[in-house]
UniProtKB/Swiss-Prot annotation:
It comes from the Bacteria. Belongs to the RecR family. It holds the Pfam family Toprim_4. SUPFAM superfamilies: Recombination protein RecR (SSF111304). One of its GO terms (molecular function) is zinc ion binding. Gene3D superfamilies: 3.40.1360.10, 6.10.250.240, RecR Domain 1. The gene is recR. It comes from Ralstonia nicotianae (strain ATCC BAA-1114 / GMI1000). A zinc finger (C4-type) spans 62-77. InterPro entries: DNA_Rcmb_RecR (IPR000093), Rcmb_RecR (IPR023627), Rcmb_RecR_Znf (IPR015967), TOPRIM_dom (IPR006171), TOPRIM_RecR (IPR034137). PROSITE patterns: TOPRIM (PS50880). This is Recombination protein RecR. One of its GO terms (biological process) is DNA recombination. SMART domains: TOPRIM.
Amino acid sequence: MMRGGPGTPSALQMLIEALRVLPGVGPKSAQRMAYHLLQHDREGASRLAEALAEAAESIHHCSRCNTFTEQDVCETCLDPRRDASVLCVVETPADQMMIEQTLTYRGQYFVLMGRLSPLDNIGPKEIHLERLLARATDPALGGPCAEVILATNFTSEGEATAHYIGEMLKARGIKVSRLARGVPVGGELEYVDAGTIARAVLDRRQL
């Protein structure tokens, strides 16, 4: 691991390097965060460390939908008021949360935890497509689904992922739909307002 120069404590440099794993945080930003925590908010730094350790220890993936949960099966999958025959496929738990905030969707989810990206060696296995297929078709897991809504992002990789999944599911006779184009091309659900997402879900088109 990279160490600091003369006079730089190794523990500080390790903290800076650790903060750089956050998206959008470069060396300068990580350094500012580290110095702020140590200089102005040591209590906050301790709370952050404890919360991170607790989350890393207790949060794992739902055995049905693959989202984050502290139980074997998440609350959404266990909710009897949800329509288990309709499945919405999203890239991340953050995307799932955005759709939930629209209050327009009452089905269940499957979270890919990514999208197809051959250049990054991310293929069908890495985004759990075997598990998705089982969830959509196996009666023991809530299948067969009456409809699968593809809510991957409208990026080139998200579109390619939606196409791949759509062909896979249609070959099994499952109805597949895609979010309407209210979501901007190149846009990610995490950064789109709830009203736009709600309209995209309601106006979804069959593939």
